[in-house]
Amino acid sequence: LSRPRLSVAALNPHAGDNGNFGMEEIEVINPTVETLQAKQVNVDGPWPSDTVFLKAKAGEVDGIITMYHDQGQIALKLMGFDRGVTVQGGIPFPVTTPAHGTAFDIAGTGSADVGATRAAFDIACDMVSHWNSAA
């Protein structure tokens, strides 16, 4: 995707409810979203984390940015356990993992579905390709 549509999940219930449930949305998340929008990143939010994934399910966005790992994993696994991919952020190199994790418990049994692993690999390759072309 050359210009993915992204939505940001809030950290606090009800996206902070104007500071009643926490100030992170007001002090950190909203300003960050606004900075990204000013840089022409196609991003919106923050949205309440209990409903933001409905946007993805409806095809309205290409990705959801979550505030912590498990916030995104529940929805990701429910919507596509066999094809879900997690992209790690905040580090100087691309890291992707299949939503199901390592699945060591079934390694070597011939029962694993490699769809999510292939998708994670493809996304990592795409990220490296774009990263190298931007350098």
Q: Where in the sequence are the language-model features?
A:
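Glycine-rich phosphate/diphosphate-binding loop of Rossmann-like nucleotide-binding domains
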Residues: 1-46
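Glycine-rich phosphate/nucleotide-binding loop
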Residues: 28, 32-135
